[in-house]
Protein backbone atom coordinates (compact mmCIF):
# COMPACT_ATOMS: atom_id res chain seq x y z
CA UNK A 1 0.00 0.00 0.00
CA UNK A 2 3.03 2.31 -0.33
CA UNK A 3 1.47 3.92 -3.41
CA UNK A 4 -1.46 5.21 -1.34
CA UNK A 5 0.96 7.07 0.91
CA UNK A 6 3.52 8.31 -1.60
CA UNK A 7 1.11 9.74 -4.18
CA UNK A 8 -1.44 11.29 -1.83
CA UNK A 9 -2.33 14.77 -3.02
CA UNK A 10 -0.60 14.48 -6.40
CA UNK A 11 -2.08 14.77 -9.88
CA UNK A 12 -1.82 11.95 -12.43
CA UNK A 13 -1.10 13.75 -15.70
CA UNK A 14 1.80 11.83 -17.26
CA UNK A 15 4.13 9.00 -16.27
CA UNK A 16 6.99 11.43 -16.86
CA UNK A 17 6.13 12.79 -13.39
CA UNK A 18 6.59 9.45 -11.61
CA UNK A 19 9.62 7.43 -10.61
CA UNK A 20 10.13 3.77 -11.39
CA UNK A 21 9.38 2.90 -7.77
CA UNK A 22 6.13 4.88 -7.79
CA UNK A 23 4.97 3.19 -11.00
CA UNK A 24 5.78 -0.24 -9.57
CA UNK A 25 3.88 0.66 -6.39
CA UNK A 26 0.85 1.62 -8.49
CA UNK A 27 1.04 -1.69 -10.34
CA UNK A 28 1.28 -3.63 -7.07
CA UNK A 29 -1.77 -1.79 -5.78
CA UNK A 30 -3.68 -2.46 -9.02
CA UNK A 31 -2.86 -6.17 -8.77
CA UNK A 32 -4.03 -6.20 -5.14
CA UNK A 33 -7.30 -4.47 -6.03
CA UNK A 34 -7.83 -6.95 -8.87
CA UNK A 35 -7.28 -9.86 -6.49
CA UNK A 36 -9.74 -8.37 -3.99
CA UNK A 37 -12.42 -8.07 -6.66
CA UNK A 38 -11.81 -11.60 -7.89
CA UNK A 39 -12.17 -12.89 -4.32
CA UNK A 40 -15.41 -10.97 -3.87
CA UNK A 41 -13.98 -8.70 -1.18
CA UNK A 42 -15.84 -5.41 -0.72
CA UNK A 43 -13.35 -2.55 -0.37
CA UNK A 44 -14.81 0.96 -0.20
CA UNK A 45 -12.20 3.41 1.12
CA UNK A 46 -13.48 6.27 -1.08
CA UNK A 47 -16.94 6.38 0.47
CA UNK A 48 -18.30 9.91 0.51
CA UNK A 49 -15.97 11.15 -2.25
CA UNK A 50 -17.12 12.29 -5.70
CA UNK A 51 -15.30 12.27 -9.03
CA UNK A 52 -16.23 14.51 -11.96
CA UNK A 53 -15.49 13.17 -15.44
CA UNK A 54 -15.11 15.70 -18.26
CA UNK A 55 -15.22 14.37 -21.81
CA UNK A 56 -14.43 16.49 -24.85
CA UNK A 57 -13.83 13.23 -26.74
CA UNK A 58 -16.44 10.41 -26.80
CA UNK A 59 -14.98 7.36 -25.12
CA UNK A 60 -15.59 4.10 -23.33
CA UNK A 61 -13.16 5.34 -20.67
CA UNK A 62 -16.20 6.58 -18.79
CA UNK A 63 -17.26 3.02 -18.02
CA UNK A 64 -14.01 1.87 -16.40
CA UNK A 65 -13.51 5.07 -14.40
CA UNK A 66 -17.12 5.26 -13.24
CA UNK A 67 -17.28 1.58 -12.28
CA UNK A 68 -13.93 1.87 -10.52
CA UNK A 69 -15.00 4.84 -8.43
CA UNK A 70 -18.28 3.14 -7.49
CA UNK A 71 -16.50 -0.09 -6.54
CA UNK A 72 -14.23 1.92 -4.22
CA UNK A 73 -17.31 3.37 -2.52
CA UNK A 74 -17.35 6.79 -4.19
CA UNK A 75 -19.59 8.47 -6.73
CA UNK A 76 -18.88 9.54 -10.32
CA UNK A 77 -20.49 12.34 -12.29
CA UNK A 78 -20.31 12.57 -16.10
CA UNK A 79 -19.91 16.01 -17.69
CA UNK A 80 -19.69 16.87 -21.38
CA UNK A 81 -19.64 20.14 -23.29
CA UNK A 82 -23.37 20.62 -22.74
CA UNK A 83 -22.92 20.50 -18.97
CA UNK A 84 -20.10 23.05 -18.79
CA UNK A 85 -19.43 26.55 -20.08
CA UNK A 86 -16.02 25.72 -21.61
CA UNK A 87 -17.39 26.00 -25.13
CA UNK A 88 -19.09 29.31 -24.33
CA UNK A 89 -16.20 31.33 -22.98
CA UNK A 90 -15.55 30.05 -19.47
CA UNK A 91 -11.86 29.48 -18.86
CA UNK A 92 -10.34 26.21 -17.71
CA UNK A 93 -9.15 28.04 -14.60
CA UNK A 94 -12.67 29.14 -13.68
CA UNK A 95 -14.08 25.68 -14.35
CA UNK A 96 -11.41 24.19 -12.10
CA UNK A 97 -12.19 26.62 -9.29
CA UNK A 98 -15.92 25.98 -9.52
CA UNK A 99 -15.65 22.18 -9.60
CA UNK A 100 -13.26 22.35 -6.65
CA UNK A 101 -16.25 23.35 -4.53
CA UNK A 102 -18.03 20.07 -5.28
CA UNK A 103 -15.68 17.17 -6.01
CA UNK A 104 -12.45 15.57 -4.77
CA UNK A 105 -11.03 14.37 -8.09
CA UNK A 106 -11.59 15.02 -11.76
CA UNK A 107 -10.79 12.89 -14.78
CA UNK A 108 -10.59 14.77 -18.07
CA UNK A 109 -10.38 13.34 -21.58
CA UNK A 110 -9.58 16.13 -24.00
CA UNK A 111 -7.49 17.14 -27.00
CA UNK A 112 -4.86 19.63 -25.82
CA UNK A 113 -2.53 18.41 -23.07
CA UNK A 114 -2.25 22.02 -21.91
CA UNK A 115 -5.87 21.88 -20.74
CA UNK A 116 -5.09 19.04 -18.34
CA UNK A 117 -2.11 20.91 -16.95
CA UNK A 118 -4.11 24.13 -16.52
CA UNK A 119 -6.94 22.29 -14.81
CA UNK A 120 -4.51 20.76 -12.33
CA UNK A 121 -2.86 24.13 -11.71
CA UNK A 122 -6.04 25.93 -10.69
CA UNK A 123 -8.00 23.15 -8.99
CA UNK A 124 -7.84 22.39 -5.30
CA UNK A 125 -8.79 18.77 -6.09
CA UNK A 126 -6.75 16.04 -7.74
CA UNK A 127 -6.70 15.68 -11.53
CA UNK A 128 -6.26 12.59 -13.70
CA UNK A 129 -5.47 12.58 -17.41
CA UNK A 130 -7.92 10.24 -19.12
CA UNK A 131 -6.32 11.00 -22.49
CA UNK A 132 -4.93 13.93 -24.45
CA UNK A 133 -3.48 14.19 -27.94
CA UNK A 134 0.00 13.88 -26.40
CA UNK A 135 -0.34 11.29 -23.65
CA UNK A 136 -2.39 8.38 -22.34
CA UNK A 137 -0.91 7.46 -18.94
CA UNK A 138 -3.92 5.53 -17.61
CA UNK A 139 -3.82 3.21 -20.62
CA UNK A 140 -0.07 2.76 -20.27
CA UNK A 141 -0.47 1.71 -16.63
CA UNK A 142 -3.08 -0.88 -17.63
CA UNK A 143 -0.73 -2.09 -20.37
CA UNK A 144 2.10 -2.53 -17.87
CA UNK A 145 -0.17 -4.54 -15.59
CA UNK A 146 -1.14 -6.80 -18.50
CA UNK A 147 2.48 -7.32 -19.51
CA UNK A 148 3.62 -8.01 -15.95
CA UNK A 149 0.92 -10.55 -15.14
CA UNK A 150 2.37 -13.18 -17.48
CA UNK A 151 6.03 -13.39 -16.41
CA UNK A 152 5.89 -11.38 -13.15
CA UNK A 153 8.87 -9.35 -14.34
CA UNK A 154 9.75 -6.65 -16.84
CA UNK A 155 13.41 -7.61 -17.02
CA UNK A 156 14.38 -9.16 -20.34
CA UNK A 157 11.05 -8.24 -21.94
CA UNK A 158 11.01 -6.49 -25.32
CA UNK A 159 7.93 -4.45 -26.24
CA UNK A 160 7.37 -3.61 -29.91
CA UNK A 161 4.86 -0.98 -30.98
CA UNK A 162 3.98 -0.79 -34.67
CA UNK A 163 1.92 2.01 -36.19
CA UNK A 164 1.17 5.64 -35.49
CA UNK A 165 3.49 7.44 -33.08
CA UNK A 166 0.50 8.84 -31.21
CA UNK A 167 -0.40 9.48 -27.57
CA UNK A 168 -0.38 5.75 -26.80
CA UNK A 169 3.10 5.36 -28.30
CA UNK A 170 4.34 8.39 -26.35
CA UNK A 171 3.07 6.99 -23.06
CA UNK A 172 4.36 3.48 -23.78
CA UNK A 173 7.87 4.73 -24.56
CA UNK A 174 8.18 6.31 -21.14
CA UNK A 175 6.34 3.54 -19.27
CA UNK A 176 8.40 0.72 -20.78
CA UNK A 177 11.72 2.47 -20.22
CA UNK A 178 10.89 3.32 -16.61
CA UNK A 179 10.06 -0.26 -15.61
CA UNK A 180 13.09 -1.75 -17.36
CA UNK A 181 11.80 -3.10 -20.66
CA UNK A 182 13.44 -2.74 -24.04
CA UNK A 183 11.04 -0.84 -26.28
CA UNK A 184 11.01 -0.46 -30.07
CA UNK A 185 8.61 1.79 -31.98
CA UNK A 186 8.13 1.36 -35.75
CA UNK A 187 6.24 4.04 -37.64
CA UNK A 188 6.28 5.72 -41.06
CA UNK A 189 8.51 8.76 -41.60
CA UNK A 190 6.73 11.83 -40.32
CA UNK A 191 4.58 9.88 -37.86
CA UNK A 192 7.13 9.36 -35.09
CA UNK A 193 6.37 9.83 -31.38
CA UNK A 194 6.87 13.32 -29.97
CA UNK A 195 10.51 14.27 -29.58
CA UNK A 196 10.28 15.07 -25.86
CA UNK A 197 8.89 11.61 -25.08
CA UNK A 198 11.57 9.87 -27.15
CA UNK A 199 14.30 11.90 -25.45
CA UNK A 200 12.85 11.26 -21.99
CA UNK A 201 12.64 7.51 -22.65
CA UNK A 202 16.22 7.47 -23.94
CA UNK A 203 17.46 9.24 -20.80
CA UNK A 204 15.70 6.66 -18.64
CA UNK A 205 17.04 3.84 -20.81
CA UNK A 206 20.58 5.09 -20.32
CA UNK A 207 20.08 4.93 -16.55
CA UNK A 208 18.48 1.48 -16.55
CA UNK A 209 20.59 -0.07 -19.30
CA UNK A 210 17.55 -0.74 -21.49
CA UNK A 211 17.33 -0.12 -25.22
CA UNK A 212 14.94 2.46 -26.71
CA UNK A 213 14.56 2.25 -30.49
CA UNK A 214 12.53 4.31 -32.96
CA UNK A 215 12.66 2.90 -36.49
CA UNK A 216 10.81 3.02 -39.79
CA UNK A 217 11.15 -0.76 -40.23
CA UNK A 218 8.46 -2.87 -38.51
CA UNK A 219 10.60 -6.01 -38.83
CA UNK A 220 13.39 -4.36 -36.84
CA UNK A 221 10.94 -3.44 -34.09
CA UNK A 222 9.22 -6.83 -33.92
CA UNK A 223 12.36 -9.00 -34.17
CA UNK A 224 12.57 -11.07 -30.99
CA UNK A 225 9.72 -9.17 -29.35
CA UNK A 226 7.86 -10.59 -26.34
CA UNK A 227 4.93 -8.19 -26.71
CA UNK A 228 3.53 -6.58 -29.87
CA UNK A 229 1.28 -3.54 -29.63
CA UNK A 230 -0.62 -1.47 -32.16
CA UNK A 231 -3.33 1.18 -32.30
CA UNK A 232 -5.69 2.60 -34.90
CA UNK A 233 -4.14 4.44 -37.83
CA UNK A 234 -6.64 7.30 -37.74
CA UNK A 235 -7.43 8.75 -34.34
CA UNK A 236 -10.36 10.95 -33.41
CA UNK A 237 -9.99 14.35 -35.03
CA UNK A 238 -7.93 12.97 -37.94
CA UNK A 239 -10.83 11.76 -40.06
CA UNK A 240 -9.90 14.07 -42.96
CA UNK A 241 -6.54 12.25 -43.18
CA UNK A 242 -8.07 8.77 -43.24
CA UNK A 243 -7.50 7.92 -46.93
CA UNK A 244 -3.90 9.11 -46.85
CA UNK A 245 -3.18 7.29 -43.61
CA UNK A 246 -4.59 4.01 -44.93
CA UNK A 247 -1.99 4.10 -47.70
CA UNK A 248 0.92 5.30 -45.58
CA UNK A 249 0.39 2.79 -42.78
CA UNK A 250 -0.39 -0.31 -44.87
CA UNK A 251 3.19 -1.66 -44.55
CA UNK A 252 2.79 -1.36 -40.77
CA UNK A 253 -0.10 -3.77 -40.40
CA UNK A 254 0.38 -6.35 -37.65
CA UNK A 255 -0.34 -9.55 -39.54
CA UNK A 256 0.54 -13.22 -39.51
CA UNK A 257 3.71 -12.64 -41.53
CA UNK A 258 5.06 -9.84 -39.33
CA UNK A 259 4.52 -11.67 -36.04
CA UNK A 260 6.73 -14.54 -37.27
CA UNK A 261 9.66 -12.27 -36.40
CA UNK A 262 8.60 -12.16 -32.74
CA UNK A 263 9.09 -14.86 -30.13
CA UNK A 264 6.68 -17.79 -30.56
CA UNK A 265 4.97 -17.01 -27.25
CA UNK A 266 4.57 -13.29 -27.98
CA UNK A 267 1.46 -11.53 -26.71
CA UNK A 268 -0.57 -9.10 -28.80
CA UNK A 269 -1.94 -5.91 -27.24
CA UNK A 270 -4.27 -3.20 -28.54
CA UNK A 271 -5.86 -0.36 -26.57
CA UNK A 272 -9.14 -0.73 -28.53
CA UNK A 273 -11.32 -0.10 -30.40
CA UNK A 274 -9.60 -2.06 -33.19
CA UNK A 275 -10.18 -1.99 -36.93
CA UNK A 276 -9.63 -5.55 -38.12
CA UNK A 277 -8.14 -5.56 -41.58
CA UNK A 278 -6.39 -2.23 -41.06
CA UNK A 279 -3.80 -1.98 -38.27
CA UNK A 280 -4.23 -5.68 -37.39
CA UNK A 281 -5.61 -8.76 -39.10
CA UNK A 282 -8.47 -10.69 -37.57
CA UNK A 283 -6.18 -13.70 -37.29
CA UNK A 284 -3.82 -11.89 -34.94
CA UNK A 285 -6.48 -9.90 -33.12
CA UNK A 286 -8.59 -12.96 -32.34
CA UNK A 287 -5.74 -15.46 -32.19
CA UNK A 288 -4.35 -17.40 -29.22
CA UNK A 289 -1.60 -14.84 -28.55
CA UNK A 290 -4.03 -11.94 -28.16
CA UNK A 291 -4.72 -10.56 -24.67
CA UNK A 292 -6.60 -7.43 -25.75
CA UNK A 293 -9.71 -8.10 -23.68
CA UNK A 294 -7.76 -8.94 -20.54
CA UNK A 295 -5.87 -5.72 -21.25
CA UNK A 296 -9.16 -3.81 -21.47
CA UNK A 297 -10.24 -5.30 -18.15
CA UNK A 298 -7.04 -4.13 -16.52
CA UNK A 299 -7.98 -0.51 -17.18
CA UNK A 300 -10.47 -0.83 -14.34
CA UNK A 301 -7.88 -2.01 -11.84
CA UNK A 302 -5.18 0.43 -12.96
CA UNK A 303 -7.57 3.36 -12.71
CA UNK A 304 -8.81 2.24 -9.29
CA UNK A 305 -5.18 2.21 -8.15
CA UNK A 306 -4.70 5.75 -9.44
CA UNK A 307 -7.83 7.04 -7.70
CA UNK A 308 -7.02 5.34 -4.42
CA UNK A 309 -3.43 6.56 -4.50
CA UNK A 310 -4.04 10.26 -5.12
CA UNK A 311 -7.08 10.70 -2.84
From Swiss-Prot:
Task: List the GO cellular component terms.
Answer: cytoplasm
GO terms in the biological process aspect are: arginine biosynthetic process via ornithine; citrulline biosynthetic process; L-arginine biosynthetic process
Its taxonomic placement starts with:
Bacteria, Bacillati, Bacillota, Bacilli, Bacillales
Q: Which InterPro entries match?
A: Asp/Orn_carbamoyltranf_P-bd, Asp/Orn_carbamoylTrfase, Asp/Orn_carbamoylTrfase_sf, Asp_carbamoyltransf_Asp/Orn-bd, Orn/put_carbamltrans, OTCase_ArgI
Q: Which organism is it from?
A: Geobacillus stearothermophilus (Bacillus stearothermophilus)
Protein known as: Ornithine carbamoyltransferase
What is a single Pfam family found in this protein's UniProt entry?
OTCace
Top-level taxon of origin: Bacteria
Q: Outline what the protein does.
A: Reversibly catalyzes the transfer of the carbamoyl group from carbamoyl phosphate (CP) to the N(epsilon) atom of ornithine (ORN) to produce L-citrulline.
Q: In which pathway does it act?
A: Amino-acid biosynthesis; L-arginine biosynthesis; L-arginine from L-ornithine and carbamoyl phosphate: step 1/3
Amino acid sequence: MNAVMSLKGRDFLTLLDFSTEEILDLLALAADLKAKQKAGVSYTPLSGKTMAMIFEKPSGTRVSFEVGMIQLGGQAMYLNGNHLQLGRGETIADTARVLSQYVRVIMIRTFAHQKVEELAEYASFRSSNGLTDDDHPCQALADLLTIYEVKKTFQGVKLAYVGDGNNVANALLVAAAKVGMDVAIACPPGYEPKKEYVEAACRVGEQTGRRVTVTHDPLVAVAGADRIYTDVWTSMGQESESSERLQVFQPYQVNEELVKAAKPDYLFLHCLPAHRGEEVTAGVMDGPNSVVFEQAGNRLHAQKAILLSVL
